[in-house]
Design a protein with these regions (language model features):
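C-terminal substrate-recognition "lid" of short-chain dehydrogenase/reductases
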Residues: 2, 229-257, 262
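Catalytic loop of short-chain dehydrogenase/reductase
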Residues: 94-97, 106-112, 136, 142-173, ...
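The beta1-alpha1 cofactor-binding region of Rossmann-like NAD(H)/NADP(H)-dependent oxidoreductases
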Residues: 41, 62-74, 110, 235
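Conserved glycine-rich Rossmann-like NAD(P)H-binding loop of the short-chain dehydrogenase/reductase
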Residues: 28-46
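Active-site loop of short-chain dehydrogenase/reductase
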Residues: 6, 55-57, 84-85, 135-149, ...
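Conserved glycine-rich cofactor-binding loop
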Residues: 7, 14-15
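A glycine/serine/threonine-rich, flexible loop-to-helix segment
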Residues: 44-46, 102-103, 158, 198-224, ...
Length: 278
């Protein structure tokens, strides 16, 4: 799919991964819809200022994506403004960390479960449910569900310090949604999942949780990753653009971008003397 003049809805665009994706789409000539939440006022203000500087036809909309009525109105505004929707980057999540929040049954933590499930899972469903009819009527489309390896590894290994139970379960469900939506959206809309590991903008230096880990704990996460480091933001942007522009014959699939974390950091052992290595 060519990006120029296409309409793109990017969730989580006020900061981090979503902002980088939205900015690059705008630079490529897309008309970008930017939903934002009142929880992030400074980031949302900066986002709107930067996109105003790009020129072009972009739309920033305040919305709580966990609210069915507000999501329906969001898509209505997209249809009224642009008449089409071609690209949906379903990038919204809230994940608690055991090392930060502790158990769900702590008094200060009673709402954490609902926050993780409603934001990571319910909001994604609400947006696709409301956006898909418009996308199917827009000649061609692509949906990218951004998820986490938490759904694959759960609380195992060093990731057990980072991923809460509810967050991990919600991400496992996203893979099921991806397959279901791929069937519902075919043949005009492709639906794929981008499953992310540890990145400089996620659970790495300067982000919540990472500073609470000891040096040995940080080292164990990197050692558990075959490439022995967190990924970079531009790695994610490149993967998203591959799924939009080049993955013409790909739908219902999961593209895992984790530096080999899921494989456990275990390399092929050196064979004993006298046995040829491959």
């Amino acid at each position: 799919m060519e990006i120029k003049d296409k309409v793109a809805l990017v969730l989580g665009a006020s900061k981090g991964i979503g902002f980088a994706i939205a900015r690059t789409l705008a630079e490529e000539g897309a008309k970008v819809v930017l939903p934002y939440h009142s929880d992030w006022p400074e980031e949302s203000d900066e986002m709107q200022k930067e996109f105003a500087g790009f020129g072009g036809n972009h739309l920033a909309i305040p919305v709580d994506l966990r609210d069915a009525v507000q999501v329906k109105d969001l898509i209505r505004q997209v249809q009224e403004r642009f008449g089409a929707l071609h690209i949906l980057v379903n990038n919204i999540e809230r994940g608690g960390m055991p090392v930060v929040h502790g158990s769900y049954d702590l008094e200060v933590n009673r709402e954490q479960w609902d926050l993780e499930i409603d934001t990571t899972l319910k909001a994604k469903w609400l947006v696709v449910h409301n956006a898909l009819p418009l996308m199917k009527n827009s000649s061609e489309g692509v949906i990218i569900n951004v998820s986490s390896i938490a759904g694959f590894v759960g609380r195992s290994g060093p990731a057990g310090l980072i991923f809460n139970d509810g967050y991990a379960a919600a991400n496992r469900a996203i893979s099921s949604f991806t397959e279901t939506w791929a069937r519902e959206a075919a043949p005009t809309v492709r639906v794929n999942e981008l499953m992310l590991g540890f990145f400089e903008t996620r659970h790495a230096e300067g982000t919540r949780g990472w500073e609470n880990l000891s040096g040995s704990e940080k080292e164990s996460i990197c050692k558990h990753t075959l490439l022995q480091s967190p990924g970079r933001l531009d790695d994610i942007v490149k993967a998203v653009f591959f799924l939009i522009k080049d993955a013409r014959f790909m739908t219902g699939a999961v593209l895992r971008l984790d530096g080999g974390y899921v494989l456990g950091g275990e390399q092929v052992p050196v064979m004993p003397d006298g046995i040829l290595n491959s």
